[in-house]
Regions:
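Membrane-embedded alpha-helical bundles of multi-pass transporters/translocases
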Residues: 2-137
Length: 137
């Protein structure tokens, strides 16, 4: 096993530190609640009653988390083994990071009217899967 240099350790720490706001801001405190409110309004404008619309919005968000979590859980062992055997980690970190940045930069399309609701949900969780996949390397 190759010995990690201080440069590699600091680089990994910086990468991990820089990716954490996505989880805090995106999943937990800002985008998740915003998505739920916008989705509830969207469902209410489609004729669903208030409480049912809120439940449907939360269900949609949690379904996205469930599907992406399962994808991550099933692919992580294979990506980890590939990372360990290939020895070329930086190109894969770059690939998944670019995928993450492109997907997350497109969530601006979710307007308060609910335009592109499902597309933004898919993009957000593509970004989530890509961010988690980059951490395997």
């Amino acid at each position: 096993m190759a010995q990690a240099t201080k440069k590699h350790i600091w680089g990994w720490m910086a990468f991990d530190w820089a990716s954490q706001p996505f989880y805090t801001v995106g999943l937990t405190f800002v985008f998740g609640p915003y998505f739920a409110v916008v989705a509830a309004e969207y469902f209410m404008s489609s004729g669903v009653e208030g409480g049912a619309a809120k439940a449907q919005a939360q269900s949609l968000w949690s379904s996205g988390q469930t599907v992406s979590g399962l994808i991550i859980a099933f692919t992580a062992p294979f990506l980890g083994a590939f990372a360990d055997n290939s020895g070329r980690k930086i190109p894969w970190i770059a690939f998944f990071s670019v995928m993450f940045v492109v997907a997350i930069s497109m969530i601006w399309m979710l307007t308060p009217e609910g335009a592109a609701l499902y597309l933004v949900l898919i993009l957000f969780f593509i970004a989530f899967i890509a961010a988690e996949s980059a951490l395997n390397f």
